[in-house]
């Protein structure tokens, strides 16, 4: 057997190192890909099974669930315009792209590993080709069950359940304090002025309604109960607002809304709740939502408003 000269040995060793490095790189890449595609099975309320990332890192949210993902420390890369306009989300959505279901190409460029939205969107089939897509029917679940369901989708069910339990306990405690301050029989109305139309709300249409009526057990006026409880909301003309206002009014107003001149109208000033200084004005952009982050904020708002010394 011939002995290898130094040059041949050196060349073979070099080739071996290169091959070894390539092999190590390939193994590393395979491990990275394996970690990146690790999935768990999410089962929808209709029984459909969807493979979703075990630890989603690039989520596009096309509906009002961004606050839950922020609260559960899940990274968002794309979000709907309504959520982007919520000042309470600004820190959690810093640098996040604003998209809609129509922006298929833009969403593709974001390279999401999970898409969450409502089932009334267009392009759902195209979106599901980009990433696992989970769509919900608005109002199909109770507002707290919806939060837990979002937790399941992003593999944060334990965190979601713990939040719900703590929130309910706190809301009920604060509710008892509020009843003690305003009286067991006091009535509360939630109203909002939007696009030259006034709306009153039932007990499950965001804007703090779930907290006031479901968790705290506060009373709504009979006129609100008759018209808005089942439907969720009821549109009225501004001038008849007084017919629906209880002892207290939660008025949701957009900070930039040019249609708030009614606040200076005589008919508004003559409403008893207004005359008694029992109107609490909330920023509509923070009240449109009923995700966990927004509910925490709304609960604090009610505690400070009703129990202010």
How should each PLM-predicted stretch be described?
Residues 124-161, 183, 263-281:
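Charged, glycine-enriched surface loops/patches
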Residues 49-52, 56, 133-136, 149-164, ...:
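Second-shell loop/turn segments in exported
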Residues 2-9, 20-61, 159-191, 254-259, ...:
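Bacterial Sec-exported substrate-binding components of ABC uptake systems
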Residues 83-86, 200-232:
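Alpha-helical, coiled-coil/dimerization segments enriched in small aliphatic residues
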């Amino acid at each position: 057997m011939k002995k290898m000269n130094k040059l041949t040995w050196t060349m073979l060793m070099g080739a071996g190192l290169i091959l070894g490095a390539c092999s190590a790189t390939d193994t590393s890449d395979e491990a990275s890909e394996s970690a990146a595609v690790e999935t768990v099975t999410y089962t929808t309320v209709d029984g459909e099974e969807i493979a979703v990332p075990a630890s989603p890192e690039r989520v596009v949210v096309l509906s009002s669930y961004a606050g839950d993902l922020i609260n559960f420390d899940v990274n968002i890369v794309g979000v709907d315009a309504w959520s982007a306009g919520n000042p309470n989300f600004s820190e959690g959505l810093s640098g996040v792209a604003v998209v809609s279901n129509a922006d298929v190409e833009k969403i593709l460029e974001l390279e999401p590993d999970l898409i969450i939205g409502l089932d009334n969107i267009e392009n759902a089939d195209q979106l599901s080709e980009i990433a696992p897509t989970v769509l919900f029917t608005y109002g199909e679940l109770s507002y707290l069950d919806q939060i837990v369901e979002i937790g399941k989708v992003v593999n944060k069910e334990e965190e979601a359940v713990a939040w719900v339990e703590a929130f309910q306990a706190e809301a009920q405690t604060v509710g008892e304090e509020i009843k003690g301050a305003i009286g067991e029989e006091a009535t509360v109305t939630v109203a909002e002025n939007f696009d030259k139309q006034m709306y009153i709300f039932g007990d499950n249409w965001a804007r703090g309604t779930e907290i006031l009526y479901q968790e705290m057990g506060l009373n709504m006026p009979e006129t609100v109960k008759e018209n808005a409880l089942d439907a969720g909301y009821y549109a009225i003309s501004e001038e008849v607002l007084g017919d629906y206002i209880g002892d207290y009014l939660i008025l949701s107003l957009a900070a930039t809304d040019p249609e708030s001149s009614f606040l200076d109208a005589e008919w508004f000033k003559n409403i008893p709740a207004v005359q008694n200084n029992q109107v609490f004005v909330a920023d509509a952009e923070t009240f449109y939502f009923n995700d966990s982050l927004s509910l925490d904020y709304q609960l604090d708002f009610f505690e400070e408003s009703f129990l202010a010394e």
